[in-house]
């Protein structure tokens, strides 16, 4: 049996960044939990991170990412540099290489996807999503982005609602965090 599921989305708009995730944890064909929290604030609330994949692996990756951000002696928060450093370690370290998860990290200026294959992707649009319902949420978000009246949080929330209607591994118990 394997764990499946999760949809996480990050949106930037109007000087604000929102990250949202559904709450469903599925094991095989069974929903084990409907209110899991898959996003976290890091570095005193200045960075948002979300994960898709194994929970224990994600916690390890959150900790490693935060270490990379804090490793700069000048105190500057550079999530791009930290993401590249984490991706290098994740790909080359024998223990980290076995971790099965994907991460989204975001601050007020950047949104990044980090994968275990060493990819660090910064989207062209200020939208990115991961997980089983990621493509549904992403498509919905691109459409919602055309409505200039919607905030980053509104778009993230509405996009996850769409994904929850289509993806059996995504529910509508949404946790949303926002920073500016």
From Swiss-Prot:
Keywords of this entry: Allosteric enzyme, Cytoplasm, Hydrolase, Metal-binding, Protease, Sodium, Threonine protease
The organism's place on the tree of life at top rank: Bacteria
Any Pfam family matching the protein: Proteasome
UniProt keyword Hydrolase, yes or no: yes
Record localization: Cytoplasm
Gene Ontology CC, one term: proteasome core complex
UniProt keyword annotation of Cell cycle present: no
One MF term in the entry's GO annotations: metal ion binding
EC number of the protein: 3.4.25.2
Activity control mechanisms: Allosterically activated by HslU binding.
Residues annotated as binding Na(+): 164, 167, 170
InterPro entries, sorted: ATP-dep_Prtase_HsIV_su, Ntn_hydrolases_N, Proteasome_sua/b, Proteasome_suB-type
CDD domains from the UniProt entry: protease_HslV (cd01913)
Active site per database record: 6
BP GO annotations: proteolysis involved in protein catabolic process
Catalyzed reactions per annotation: ATP-dependent cleavage of peptide bonds with broad specificity
Quaternary assembly: A double ring-shaped homohexamer of HslV is capped on each side by a ring-shaped HslU homohexamer. The assembly of the HslU/HslV complex is dependent on binding of ATP.
Function statement: Protease subunit of a proteasome-like degradation complex believed to be a general protein degrading machinery.
Protein family: Belongs to the peptidase T1B family. HslV subfamily.
Name of the protein in question: ATP-dependent protease subunit HslV
Organism: Borrelia hermsii (strain HS1 / DAH)
